[in-house]
């Protein structure tokens, strides 16, 4: 039997493909407009054709993939760590209004502090290895993910929670049966919002701490005037960010549609 959700999934996939194509077109158009309106030397500013020619060389791609893999690994560590910590803290705050009133303003204020100013302290404390890189990535993910997840937990209908408790359910049971199902789509939203931030955090950690991955290579390329490789790295990272963002957006829509249909 054909699943009733198949047509909607196909529509979501088609919509995601169109959005991805539109994003790529807008980026390339903006890139070309920038090159034609700003007087920058062609030696420094590379065109889409220059990047295409660079990436068309197999040796160039072979040298870039391991660096990209390291950056994505660093980003994944920070992304997963930040999301897990945000999920735990948001659950704790959702269970306790006093804790939320005590700590949430401070956590929100921390978001206003540029990570560039904190990164040297983090590097001194945790070193230039995996721990320091993961901490920086998690730090840039944590606060926006926390606020989004907490909003989802608070969105559970009060009437449903009261019904659950009226039938003898504990606070934890009400959370599992009512609060968490309503929060799941919002948690996917948190993942979509922060996934590109985690890649930026990984690049920042590689620039300031480890010197590894594409972040470290981009710093060396800027110092060594390897502008074709630098622009190609930026394009590859941008493409990865757009693709990952669209995949998570599709998952978010699919989960939201499924949760809405089952309520």
Predicted feature residues:
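Transmembrane-helix boundary motif in ABC transporter permease subunits
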Residues: 77-107
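Short cytoplasmic-facing helical segments at TM-TM junctions of multi-pass membrane proteins
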Residues: 148-193, 214, 218
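Generic hydrophobic transmembrane alpha-helix motif, especially the helices
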Residues: 108-144, 151-152
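Glycine-rich helix-loop "coupling/hinge" segments at transmembrane-helix boundaries
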Residues: 123-125, 200-237, 256-263
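Periplasmic/extracellular loop-to-transmembrane helix junction in inner-membrane transport proteins
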Residues: 5-9, 37-83
């Amino acid at each position: 039997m054909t699943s009733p959700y198949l047509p909607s999934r196909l529509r979501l996939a088609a919509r995601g493909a169109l959005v991805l194509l539109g994003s790529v077109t807008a980026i390339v158009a903006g890139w070309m407009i920038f090159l034609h309106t700003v007087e920058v030397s062609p030696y420094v500013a590379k065109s889409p054709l220059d990047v295409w020619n660079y990436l068309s060389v197999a040796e160039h791609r072979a040298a870039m993939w391991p660096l990209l893999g390291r950056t994505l690994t660093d980003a994944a560590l920070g992304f997963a760590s930040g999301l897990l910590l945000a999920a735990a803290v948001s659950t704790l705050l959702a269970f306790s209004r006093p804790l939320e009133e005590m700590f949430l303003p401070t956590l929100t204020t921390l978001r206003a502090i540029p990570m560039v100013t904190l990164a040297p302290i983090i590097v001194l404390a945790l070193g230039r290895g995996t721990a320091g890189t993961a901490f920086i990535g998690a730090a840039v993910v944590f606060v926006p993910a926390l606020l989004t997840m907490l909003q989802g937990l608070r969105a559970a209908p009060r009437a449903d929670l009261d019904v659950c408790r009226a039938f003898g359910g504990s606070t934890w049971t009400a959370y599992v049966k009512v609060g968490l199902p309503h929060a799941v789509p919002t948690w996917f939203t948190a993942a979509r919002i922060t996934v590109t931030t985690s890649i930026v955090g990984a690049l920042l950690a590689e620039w300031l701490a480890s010197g590894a991955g594409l972040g470290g290579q981009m710093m060396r390329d800027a110092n060594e005037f390897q502008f074709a490789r630098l622009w190609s790295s930026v394009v590859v990272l941008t493409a990865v960010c757009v693709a990952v963002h669209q995949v998570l957006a599709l998952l978010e829509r699919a989960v939201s549609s499924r949760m809405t249909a089952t309520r």
